[in-house]
């Protein structure tokens, strides 16, 4: 995922989270808002409760790989994906299915508005 497709600044994370549009399950909480670009921007956050830095980086890489499989970047949205304590590093397919469910819910909400 290229740099321009990422949300990096703390202030941008806070603005997206404060928009209070979100979907969540036991693995993820995804906050979203529309943006003025022709593409999506994605930020991933993994809390220190999930483990040491090595584990958190691995989790972020896995989530980025899942998003490359599932999400088309042509939708003008900003997403902040917060990985929750229920996430399991070993069970990639279950994590992928849970993420797909949430992204489908978000797409349905956007198309209904």
PLM ranges: what are they?
Residues 1-113:
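Positively charged, solvent-exposed patches that mediate nucleic-acid binding
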């Amino acid at each position: 995922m290229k740099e321009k497709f990422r949300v990096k600044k703390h202030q941008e994370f806070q603005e997206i989270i404060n928009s209070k549009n979100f979907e969540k399950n036991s693995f993820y909480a995804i906050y979203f808002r529309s943006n003025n670009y022709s593409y999506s921007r994605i930020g991933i956050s993994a809390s220190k409760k999930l483990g040491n830095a090595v584990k958190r980086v691995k989790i972020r890489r896995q989530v980025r790989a899942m998003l490359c499989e599932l999400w088309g970047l042509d939708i003008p949205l900003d997403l902040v994906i917060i990985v929750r304590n229920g996430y399991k590093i070993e069970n990639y397919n279950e994590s992928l299915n849970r993420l797909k469910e949430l992204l489908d819910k978000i797409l349905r909400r956007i198309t209904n508005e």
